[in-house]
Amino acid sequence: MKAVQTPCIGICSTTSLGDAVCRGCKRYSFEVINWNSYDDVAKSAVLSRIEKLICQILGNKLQIFSVPNLKKGLEKAKIPYDPSLSPYCWLHNLLKKNHQKIDNLREYGVCALPEFSGVSLTALSETIERELLVLCEAHFNRYFELPGGNGRT
């Protein structure tokens, strides 16, 4: 069995800015700190939580109609993806790292749902990131709130 990989994308706001939730990978600060000591079951639980939140946010705005085209696009753009996770997680990686270089989302096997079809990909990507961070922070505050507030230090 392949070891569970870190979701880190190299821009950790928990260590650099003191955020309770990383703006990059969406892990909680204590998960970032303790990641290397977690067993594969614990790591998978973290990834599963993040995957569900990503699918919830992206699935309300975008539809993947061709997973093979999405894979080809990811490979062409050299964007890594974890085949054990939902294609919506792959799409999230693509948008996070490459949205400014995408002219036609349909070439990647993806289309915006009707209510978002008139929104630029940059604006949509920013909305997705903002909503995802808010959802992750709400989950953190609900279950792991730090003394004294909103989870930010």
Regions found by a protein language model. Give the residues of each.
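Short flanking/linker segments adjacent to small metal-binding domains or redox-active Cys/His motifs
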Residues: G59-F116
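C-terminal, charged low-complexity interaction regions
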Residues: K101-T153
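Exposed alpha-helical structural elements
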Residues: P7, A42-A45, N69, W90, ...
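N-terminal cysteine/histidine-rich coordination modules
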Residues: M1-Q63
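Alpha-helical protein-protein interaction elements
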Residues: K26-R27, D82, L132-L135
